[in-house]
Design a protein with these regions (language model features):
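Short, contiguous alpha-helical
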Residues: 1-17, 52-98, 126-127, 138-181
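Small-residue-biased structural context
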Residues: 2-6, 23-25, 32, 42, ...
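Short, contiguous, helix-prone interaction/anchoring segments in small proteins
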Residues: 21-57
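Alpha-helix N-cap/loop-to-helix boundary motif
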Residues: 25, 32, 58, 69-73, ...
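Residue-level recognition of alpha-helical structural elements
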Residues: 29, 52, 59, 107, ...
């Protein structure tokens, strides 16, 4: 597979791009967080069990793994935000997403478990985000020990808004390539 095609399959909406703080971006990214569960649910709508076990690209996760991964990732994100809002530059806990994707809950449980979790989680997350002040977006930080990097909550908001759209695009691009209506 050519490097360009592989990159497009891995990053169908491109890689995350940082943006300076703006009210317009804040509104956009918060809407992305709010509506991600519905968008992901629509992306997997009417897929059968065999389709859920197709990887979105060669060597990539299956659709089932993607859905459960988004739930795992966004649970971590929600906690990272709350810790970042209540502690001074806390060190966040990394996790091995590749190993998490191999756990039995990901392999065996139906995706509606994670979709339901995402609907509830994103309601709580969005409610929390509505009350983050502009000063907090720019000044509250967390430290990521694997990347050895301090990250503003503003950066994380954009990253996780992108992350959700990124995985919805994985599902939608596979559906399109496979001709699944």
């Amino acid at each position: 597979m050519s490097k360009v095609i592989e990159t497009n399959l891995s990053y169908p909406i491109g890689q995350y791009q940082q943006h300076p703080f703006s009210i317009d971006k804040k509104v956009e990214w918060m809407a992305d967080i709010k509506f991600l569960p519905l968008q992901l649910e629509n992306a997997v709508l009417n897929l059968d069990e065999s389709q859920l076990h197709v990887p979105y690209r060669e060597g990539g996760w299956t659709i089932q793994q993607v859905v459960h991964h988004v739930a795992d990732s966004h649970m971590n994100a929600y906690i990272r935000f709350k810790v970042g809002l209540t502690e001074d530059n806390p060190t966040i806990k990394p996790y091995n997403e590749k190993l998490w994707a191999e756990f039995s809950d990901v392999q065996k449980l139906p995706i509606n478990i994670s979709l339901t979790l995402l609907h509830a989680l994103h309601l709580r997350w969005y409610e929390t985000l509505k009350y983050v002040t502009d000063e907090q977006w720019n000044n509250r930080t967390v430290f990521h020990p694997e990347h050895k990097k301090t990250m503003r909550l503003w950066y994380l908001l954009g990253l996780y808004a992108w992350h959700g759209k990124h995985h919805v695009a994985h599902v939608n691009s596979l559906r399109e390539r496979m001709g699944w209506k």
